[in-house]
């Protein structure tokens, strides 16, 4: 708890640092950004169209998902964010995406508007969900990267490895960017490397070496890459903290889950961790142990400090990394591992171990701790990144063998591989390690390791020489890469330099083995880490936390003892450094403990520089623990280490000091082996020495406290190393060698298991498989699989390792490593080296060697092996003796390098399994297979990129199956040819088994490639090679050996823990299944007891089943996570995986493996509930295993149950028991309970209740029956009513039909009349139109003529003007021509003048020249004369001289005549001489003169020549001038001619234009004329139309007048008819009265004839009774009395005055025609007035009667006459009379006229009226046709005039007047009429003026003259009355 305050502090620091440069500002609120850039204000315009460069799946619905190659349409961009997002649509979905993921193909707009973003822009575009927790884009996308990083990198692992070889920095940068976890892990690895490099620098004291190292240049780049990756990782971590557990699990237990766990533990243990880490050394060790990740972070910080001390490139790099890591991790800005640990717990653990060791190394003997740490780190890496571990183990074994002799040579490799270890930690990054680091490490390791590896290879050739060699090469490469990769290339480079320095230092410190271990660890770790970095970082972190927390809590006490020792060795991780420092301080003891703990605990993070001394024991322990540690959390590894150390001391019997020194290595390794093998949890429980706090601190506060812890651990590690360097050297070498082999075996197991994991796990698993196979041959048997054949061990490793990988590769490694560690510890490294370390390991582990004897579980061999492992010498000898164990072949480093470089896929698959690789190389042409696999990978990649999500798996399966068949066929062919070679090579296993395994490897390899591109990460990657012998033997043999080894261990060093010892031996098998061990490690806290170890042995068997591993591999992330999580959180997927594994362990290896497989399949999508069940299941398994472990060896269950796996057997038994229990409970127990549940009281109460309910029901039934009766009655009544109504309805329907028929007939007539009218009107209209058109045409013609005349005049004027203009143009042209002629003349004159002047000029010039010549001649003559004068003067002077001379000579010579002449001749006398002289002079003068004359002549001639020449030139010039003048004149002439031509052309053009204009004007004139004519025509036509219209108007007016006249006439005629009819009616009435009187008289007269009279009176009474009844109710007669009867009686009632309105309706029903008459009579309005009161009074009662029954109101006149007659005299007569009168007179004409309205009233009315009168509905049909039938115009006309007359008539009878209006709404009135409501509408409506208007027009238009006349008089009143009456009567 001491570290808790520090943890809190770091949390606050991280909170402040949370805002990493990479993170986007969260201040936007619920927005990604405050601004958006759009093409328009509404952001609805397309801005870009692009194509997706890669697949993108958004973190939530706000982001759009697309695949590579999809078209993306961008609508707007977000501005202001650190990570630029664009918003666009892909097909039908819309959302955001990073702009860098698309390539812009087209830009739609250049305009960009910055618009404020609204919160609604950041909701789900589909559904509108806005409840998002995070609006930090970098976090969201970072978490997305984290989730995708593992699968992506697993898919790209091979490619990454290739690229890594090219440039680890680049590969890391790439990985870091896409995968934050890898970044974190790399950062961790870098930190670890930094620590290691630091330590190496401290050891070397040569920073220049690091700088000189070729990779030193890489640090900056790596640091930058780390920073960016850290920034993104911070965001990712931030997101992870928010990510739910299920997400983290699905993310391969990605850093998200780890982060959550860390965060939880971080919060809970903040204070404790910080306190522990900072408070005390012991607490720091514990904290380091418990808080693996925190320790790593702290260690990385220490590494940063150490490297800062080195002050080389690393300080800057690490500071950057630390800052980046701290920022990104948000935990500690100074802790480099905070992010990395979170990202990649596994690798950070390894790195932390390495870094922890590095600080220790730098502080103390950095060389030794790093080498030791490297060994363990490589072991841990084997656990973590099994490939790395395998390489590490192989290299460790080889290096231990070689390092003893030439450990220094390999030191550079560890340095190089140091960086790689981390990368290897990640299975995903495993291939990355192959990059630069691998190359460097390979180069260095080859150089350094050549001798060592040869030795190692030689020593291991018996085992798996080629595999171990390949492993060494791999380890070298991995270590080289790790240095580059883990520190990122900068660190790798620096550390490679440091590694070289370290190599020297290690050599100096007899840590050759350490160096080799370091190199191997780095290589293997880097490779493993590269692959496993993602998974291991995730899983190891999760496992580390889960296992670390749980195991640490439980194991704190144990680990505390060992923790300090280990703490010294783990300066890099505060926890690790704390533990490791102790180990390192103690020397080999602490180193060994540290190494063994670190490998187990720090497997992923452990630097590759664990000292060889410590490496031996620590390797043994680390072999066990590291593997479990890998699978478990780093803390768990540490806990395991501590526990192992304690157990080793306690159980082994070595004193604690001894165990700390040499014994510490061996015993701790053994103890670790026991707890880890027997119970990886126990190892963890040993590590519990770390407090749970520390675990929590690791989880939660790993980073902050680790800073201090790092220093303390470094100090303690230094002290421990200084204290016991020799012991460390001795034991470290021995232990490291043995441990390497053990680890190799364990790793081989794990590696084989690992092959089957998911894509990521596959890489790791395959690497580890390679390692585990190699080590499996070497240490497989010595480990768990060692007992079994290497194949079996391989299978077991694969099985155990795969689940462990699924659960946590580290756990597997830890679980396996413990066994190996025990073997190693138990045996001296030298012995192990000499003897087959595998054998000894096998013996130590208690595993049976396939060759050695399948040692039964009960055999004491196991115990002996353990005892040997305890004694270390004996087991080592056994291992030596066991040829099968030594059989593991080693592959040369060169071959491994070539494989790494050229065969990335095969290398990544077999990275950790050299045995399988060796076997693979033996049978196949790997290059050809690699080509096929690469082709398959390319096809799968293209299919994965191009296929849609819903059919991706189908497409991938198609491609996979096509490639699979091809590759398998090729492999079979190769196998046929390679069998012979394989036999020649001679494998341990039988060739058939090897062939089967090789084919399995091929299939696994194919599946490995296939699931790198799996759409479902959890799909099983590769089915593990068929167990066959390997399966059966690993499971079965291992368990028995483990049991045996248990007694042995119990007897021997592990006697303290006899049960655990066998368990440990089983654990090797379990270590094959690290996931189970991790669970145990999870449960180790719960039980650190040895009994658990036996269960571990069961688990080992389970872990032996590779199929589970593959499933786990399917869920690689889950697998890793589950391992760590199982340890920490049983609810995680890891827990589920572990649970099955653990159950399987005790039940049977097969069952457990199956469970692991099933669990592995499930974990990826396992929800928290399932994870909880998984943890529960794991706990149950653990308890069961513990219980089984407590059983004696002879009683412990075997690997299977009579050939059946334990798991199904147990499950079946449990299910049977449960089902039986349920059955019995549901049958027997339930029956009894039911019997006793019910009592008599209850029954009686129930009966009473039932009775009550029955009574209530009876009451309800009775009430319902009553209701039913009532309803029945009601139904009957309603039926009766319905019947009545139906009868009435039938009657009304009949009447309606009749009325409709009459309406139709009337309508037809009206239509015909209307048609006639319309035709006539049309003809009139046409005629008028023709007239108007003619007039208009005439006017138009006139207009056109006038227009044409005006246009002609205008055209003429225009023509005249044109002519004038033309004349003007011509005159102008003449003037121009004249001017031109004048100019020409002037030009000629000027030319002549020019010529004259030129001539005169020439003459003057000639004269001038002649004068000049004469002047010159004179001057020449003067000169000649002057010359002559001078010559003469000379002669004279000479003569004078001669004379003087002669005078002077005369006296001398005295007449010597012989004197020579001047010319040498002897002259005569002087005189002669003088004369001669004078002659000579004269001759001379003459000649001179002659010469001068000749010269003058010559000069003259020359002058003449010159003059002639000049004249010639002048003449020529003149000629030229003349020619020029001539040409100029010609040109001028040509110009003038051209001008003339142009002028002529212009004239012509003007003429043409004029003509054209003239033509155009003419055209315009013609057009205008035409237009004018058209206008005139139109006008004339319009005039004609106007005239026609006027005529029509006149005609219409006339017609209107005529119609009015006709209406008046019709009115008059109708009135006359009415009067006549009324008169007739009155006459009839009088006749009737007379008849009545006659009857009375007859009665009186017939008094005698009483009987006859009585009879007659009776009859009359019968007939008169009705009329009497009718009289009192005049309105009822229709309804009360049938129409026929009513005629008589009604007539009687109306009798008083037929004119007054006697009803025709009664008679009409009897005879329809009668009604028409009455209708006509109804028009009697005038007669009424005549009749006076009678009419008024009678009609009033009659109106109602008529209205009620019929429209007889219109017919009252005649009807009353008949009635009256009938009344008075006899009904029969009255009827007859009424019939006669009505039929002929009124009915036909009147009804026809009014009914027809306007058109056909008369005829129609004649027929229909009787019908109408016959029934009350009669009048209705008339009004409908009249109103509806009559078209509105006609009807209106008719109505208008008619209404007025109607009103006129109606005033007499107000009733009629009022109702008259109602008739206008016939439809309404008709409705009630149909119902025959008697009084609803009285006759007045019938009389309504409606009928009046219609009849007159109808009469006018359509009625024949005869009827019209009749209708006219009656039409206005009677007809309308009829129609209205007909309407109202119904």
UniProtKB/Swiss-Prot annotation:
Topology feature Lumenal, residues? 25-1171, 1193-1202
Positions modified as Asymmetric dimethylarginine? 1805
According to Swiss-Prot or TrEMBL, what is its membrane topology? Answer: Single-pass membrane protein
- Composition bias of kind Pro residues appears in 1706-1715, 1801-1811, 1881-1898
Q: Where is this region: SEC16A-interacting region (SIR)?
A: 1809-1869
Q: Which residues are glycosylated?
A: 360, 631
Its localization reads: Endoplasmic reticulum membrane
Positions with biased composition (Acidic residues): 317-330, 420-430, 692-701
Which top-rank group of organisms is this from? Eukaryota
- Membrane-spanning intervals of the chain: 1203-1223
Residue ranges, Cytoplasmic side: 1224-1930
What is the recorded name of this protein? Transport and Golgi organization protein 1 homolog
């Amino acid at each position: 708890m001491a570290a808790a305050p520090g943890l809190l502090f770091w949390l606050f620091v991280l909170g402040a640092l949370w805002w990493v440069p990479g993170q986007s500002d969260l201040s936007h609120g619920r927005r990604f950004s405050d601004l958006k850039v759009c093409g328009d204000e509404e952001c609805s315009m397309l801005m870009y169209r692009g194509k997706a460069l890669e697949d993108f799946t958004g973190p939530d619905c706000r982001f759009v998902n697309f695949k590579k190659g999809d078209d993306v349409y961008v609508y707007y961009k977000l501005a202001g964010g650190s990570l630029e997002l664009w918003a666009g649509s892909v097909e039908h979905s819309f959302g955001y995406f990073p702009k860098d993921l698309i390539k812009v193909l087209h830009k739609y707009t250049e305009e960009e508007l910055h618009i404020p973003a609204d919160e609604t822009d950041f909701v789900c575009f589909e559904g509108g969900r806005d409840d998002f927790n995070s609006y930090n884009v970098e976090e969201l996308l970072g978490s997305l990267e984290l989730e995708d990083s593992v699968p992506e990198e697993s898919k790209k692992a091979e490619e990454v490895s290739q690229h890594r070889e090219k440039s680890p920095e680049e590969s890391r940068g790439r990985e870091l960017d896409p995968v934050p976890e890898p970044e974190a892990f790399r950062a961790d690895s870098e930190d670890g490397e930094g620590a290691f490099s630091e330590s190496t620098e401290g050891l070397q004291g040569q920073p220049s070496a690091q700088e000189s190292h070729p990779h030193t240049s890489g640090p900056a780049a790596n640091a930058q890459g780390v920073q960016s990756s850290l920034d993104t990782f911070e965001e990712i971590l931030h997101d992870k903290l928010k990510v739910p557990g299920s997400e983290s699990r699905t993310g391969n237990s990605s850093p998200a889950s780890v982060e959550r766990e860390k965060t939880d533990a971080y919060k809970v243990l903040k204070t404790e961790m910080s306190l522990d880490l900072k408070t005390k050394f012991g607490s720091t060790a514990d904290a380091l142990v418990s808080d693996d990740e925190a320790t790593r972070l702290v260690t990385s910080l220490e590494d940063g400090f150490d490297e800062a001390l080195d002050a080389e490139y690393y300080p800057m790099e690490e500071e950057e990394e630390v800052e980046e890591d701290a920022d990104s991790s948000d935990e500690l800005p100074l802790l480099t591992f905070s992010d990395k640990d979170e990202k990649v717990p596994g690798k950070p653990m390894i790195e932390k171990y390495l870094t922890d060791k590095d600080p220790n190394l730098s502080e103390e003997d950095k060389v030794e701790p790093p080498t030791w740490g490297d060994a363990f780190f490589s072991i841990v890496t084997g656990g973590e990144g099994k490939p790395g571990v395998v390489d590490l183990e192989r290299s460790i074994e080889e290096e231990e063998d070689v390092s003893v002799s030439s450990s220094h040579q390999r030191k550079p490799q560890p340095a190089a591989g140091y960086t790689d270890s981390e990368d290897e930690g990640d299975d995903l990054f495993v291939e990355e390690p192959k990059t630069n680091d691998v190359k460097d490490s390979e180069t260095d390791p080859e150089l350094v390791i050549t001798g060592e590896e040869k030795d190692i290879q030689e020593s291991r050739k018996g085992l798996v020489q080629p595999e171990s060699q390949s492993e060494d090469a791999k380890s070298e490469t991995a270590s080289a890469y790790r240095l580059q990769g883990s520190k990122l290339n900068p660190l790798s480079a620096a550390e490679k330099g440091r590694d070289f320095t370290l190599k020297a230092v290690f050599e100096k410190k007899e840590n050759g083995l350490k160096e080799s271990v370091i190199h191997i660890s780095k290589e293997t770790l880097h490779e493993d880490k590269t692959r496993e970095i993602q998974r291991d970082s995730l899983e190891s972190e999760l496992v580390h936390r889960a296992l670390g927390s749980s195991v640490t809590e439980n194991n704190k006490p144990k680990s505390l003892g060992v923790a300090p020792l280990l703490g010294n060795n783990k300066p890099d991780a505060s926890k690790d450094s704390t533990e490791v420092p102790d180990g390192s301080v103690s020397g080999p003891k602490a180193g060994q403990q540290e190494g063994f703990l670190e490998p187990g605990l720090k497997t992923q993070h452990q630097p590759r520089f664990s000292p060889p001394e410590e490496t031996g024991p620590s390797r043994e322990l680390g072999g066990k623990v590291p593997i479990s540690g890998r699978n478990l959390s780093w803390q768990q590894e540490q806990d395991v280490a501590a526990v192992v150390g304690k157990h080793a001391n306690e159980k082994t019997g070595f004193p604690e000091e001894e165990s700390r020194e040499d014994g510490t290595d061996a015993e701790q390794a053994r103890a670790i082996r026991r707890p880890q093998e027997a119970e990886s949890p126990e190892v963890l429980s040993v590590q519990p020495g770390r407090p749970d706090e520390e675990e929590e601190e690791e989880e939660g506060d790993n980073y902050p406290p680790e800073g201090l812890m790092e220093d303390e651990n470094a100090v303690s590690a230094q002290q421990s190393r200084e204290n016991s360097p020799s012991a460390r050297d001795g034991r470290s070498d021995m232990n490291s060698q043995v441990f390497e082999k053990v680890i190799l075996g364990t790793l081989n197991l794990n590696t084989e298991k690992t092959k089957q994991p998911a894509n990521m796990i596959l890489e790791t698993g395959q690497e580890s498989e390679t390692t585990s196979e190699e080590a499996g041959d070497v240490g497989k048997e010595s480990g768990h699989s060692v007992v079994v054949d290497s194949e079996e061990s391989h299978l077991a490793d694969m099985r155990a390792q795969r689940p462990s990988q699924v659960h946590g590769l580290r756990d597997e490694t830890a679980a396996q490593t413990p066994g190996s560690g025990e073997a190693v510890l138990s045996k001296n490294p030298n012995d192990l080296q000499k003897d087959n370390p595998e054998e000894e390991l096998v013996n130590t582990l208690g595993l049976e060697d396939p060759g050695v004897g399948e040692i039964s579980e009960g055999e004491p061999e196991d115990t002996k092996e353990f005892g040997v492992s305890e004694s270390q010498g004996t087991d080592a000898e056994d291992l030596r003796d066991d040829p099968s164990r030594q059989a593991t072949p080693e592959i040369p480093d060169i071959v491994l390098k070539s494989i790494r470089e050229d065969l990335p896929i095969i290398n990544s698959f077999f990275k950790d399994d050299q045995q399988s690789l060796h076997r693979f190389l033996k049978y196949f042409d790997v290059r050809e297979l690699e080509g096929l696999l690469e082709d398959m990978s390319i096809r799968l990649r293209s299919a994965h990129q191009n296929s849609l999500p819903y059919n991706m798996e189908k497409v991938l399966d198609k491609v996979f199956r096509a490639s699979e068949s091809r590759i398998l066929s090729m492999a079979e062919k190769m196998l046929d040819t390679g069998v012979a070679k394989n036999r020649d090579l001679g494998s341990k296993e039988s060739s058939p088994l090897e062939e089967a395994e090789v084919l399995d490897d091929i299939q696994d390899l194919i599946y490995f490639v296939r699931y790198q591109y799996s759409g479902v990460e959890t799909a099983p990657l590769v089915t593990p090679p068929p167990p066959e012998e390997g399966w059966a033997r690993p499971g079965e043999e291992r368990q028995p050996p483990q049991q045996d080894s248990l007694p042995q261990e119990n007897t021997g060093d592990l006697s303290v823990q006899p049960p655990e010892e066998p368990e440990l031996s089983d654990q090797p098998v379990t270590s094959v299944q690290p996931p189970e061990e991790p669970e145990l490690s999870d449960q180790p806290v719960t039980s650190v007891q040895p009994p658990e170890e036996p269960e571990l042995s069961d688990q080992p068997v389970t872990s032996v089943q590779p199929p589970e591993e593959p499933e786990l591999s399917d869920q690689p992330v889950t697998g890793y996570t589950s391992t760590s999580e199982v340890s920490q959180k049983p609810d995680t997927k890891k827990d589920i995986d572990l649970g099955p594994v653990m159950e399987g362990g005790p039940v049977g290896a097969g069952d457990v493996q199956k469970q692991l497989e099933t669990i592995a399949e499930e974990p990826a999508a396992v929800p928290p509930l399932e994870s909880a069940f998984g943890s529960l299941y794991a706990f149950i398994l653990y308890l069961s295993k513990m219980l089984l472990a407590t059983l004696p060896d002879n009683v412990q269950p075997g690997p299977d149950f009579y050939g059946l796996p334990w798991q199904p057997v147990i499950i079946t038994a449990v299910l049977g028991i449960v089902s039986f229990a349920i059955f019995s409970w549901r049958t027997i127990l339930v029956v009894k309970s039911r019997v006793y549940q019910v009592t008599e009281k209850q029954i009686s109460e129930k009966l009473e209740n039932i009775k009550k309910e029955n009574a209530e029901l009876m009451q309800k039934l009775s009430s319902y029956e009553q209701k039913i009766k009532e309803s029945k009655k009601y139904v009957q009544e309603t039926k009766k009513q319905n019947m009545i109504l139906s009868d009435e309805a039938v009657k009304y329907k009949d009447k309606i039909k009749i009325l409709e028929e009459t309406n139709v007939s009337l309508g037809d007539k009206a239509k015909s009349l209307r048609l006639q009218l319309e035709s006539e009107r049309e003809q009139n209209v046409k005629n008028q139109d023709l007239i108007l058109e003619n007039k208009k045409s005439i006017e138009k013609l006139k207009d056109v003529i006038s227009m044409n005349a005006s246009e002609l005049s205008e055209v003429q004027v225009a023509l005249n003007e044109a002519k004038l203009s033309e004349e003007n143009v011509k005159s102008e042209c003449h003037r121009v021509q004249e001017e031109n002629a004048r100019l020409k003349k002037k030009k000629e004159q000027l030319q002549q003048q020019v010529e004259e002047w030129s001539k005169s000029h020439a003459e003057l010039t000639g004269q001038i020249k002649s004068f000049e010549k004469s002047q010159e001649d004179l001057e020449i003559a003067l000169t000649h004369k002057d010359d002559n004068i001078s010559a003469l003067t000379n002669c004279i002077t000479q003569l004078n001289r001669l004379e003087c001379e002669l005078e002077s000579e005369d006296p001398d010579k005295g007449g010597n005549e012989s004197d020579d002449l001047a010319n040498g001749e002897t002259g005569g006398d002087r005189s002669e001489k003088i004369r001669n002289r004078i002659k000579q002079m004269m001759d001379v003068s003459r000649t001179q003169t002659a010469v001068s004359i000749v010269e003058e002549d010559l000069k003259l001639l020359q002058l003449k020549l010159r003059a002639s020449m000049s004249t010639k030139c002048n003449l020529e010039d003149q000629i030229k001038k003349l020619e020029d003048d001539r040409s100029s004149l010609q040109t001028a002439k040509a110009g003038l001619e051209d001008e003339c031509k142009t002028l002529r052309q212009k004239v012509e053009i003007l003429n043409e234009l004029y003509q054209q204009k003239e033509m155009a004007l003419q055209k315009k004139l013609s057009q205008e004329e035409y237009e004018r004519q058209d206008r005139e025509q139109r006008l004339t036509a319009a005039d004609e139309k106007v005239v026609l219209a006027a005529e029509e108007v006149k005609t219409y007016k006339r017609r209107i007048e005529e119609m009015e006249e006709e209406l008046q006439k019709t009115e008059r005629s109708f009135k006359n008819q009415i009067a006549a009819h009324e008169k007739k009616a009155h006459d009839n009435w009088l006749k009737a009265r007379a008849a009545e009187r006659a009857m009375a008289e007859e009665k009186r007269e017939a008094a005698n004839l009483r009987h006859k009279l009585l009879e007659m009176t009776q009859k009359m009474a019968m007939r008169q009774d009705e009329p009497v009844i009718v009289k009192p109710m005049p309105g009822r007669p229709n309804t009360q009395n049938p129409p026929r009867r009513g005629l008589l009686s009604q007539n009687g009632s109306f009798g008083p005055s037929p004119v007054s309105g006697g009803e025709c309706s009664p008679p009409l029903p009897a005879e329809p025609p009668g009604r028409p008459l009455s209708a006509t009579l109804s028009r009697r309005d005038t007669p009424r007035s005549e009749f006076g009161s009678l009419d008024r009074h009678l009609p009033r009662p009659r109106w109602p009667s008529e209205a009620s029954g019929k429209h007889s109101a219109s017919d009252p006149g005649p009807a009353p006459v008949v009635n009256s007659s009938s009344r008075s005299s006899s009904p029969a007569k009255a009827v007859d009379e009424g019939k006669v009168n009505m039929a002929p007179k009124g009915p036909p004409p009147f009804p026809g006229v009014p009914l027809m309205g306007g058109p056909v009233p008369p005829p129609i009315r004649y027929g229909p009226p009787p019908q109408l009168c016959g029934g009350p509905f009669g009048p209705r049909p008339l009004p409908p046709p009249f109103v509806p039938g009559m078209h509105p115009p006609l009807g209106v006309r008719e109505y208008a005039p008619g209404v007025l007359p109607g009103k006129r008539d109606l005033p007499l009878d107000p009733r009629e007047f009022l109702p008259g209006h109602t008739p206008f709404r016939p439809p309404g009135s008709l409705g009630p009429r149909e119902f025959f409501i008697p009084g609803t509408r009285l006759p007045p409506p019938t009389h309504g003026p409606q009928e009046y208007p219609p009849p007159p027009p109808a009469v006018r238009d359509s009625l024949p003259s005869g009827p019209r006349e009749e209708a006219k008089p009656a039409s206005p009143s009677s007809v309308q009355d009829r129609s209205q009456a007909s309407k109202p009567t119904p």
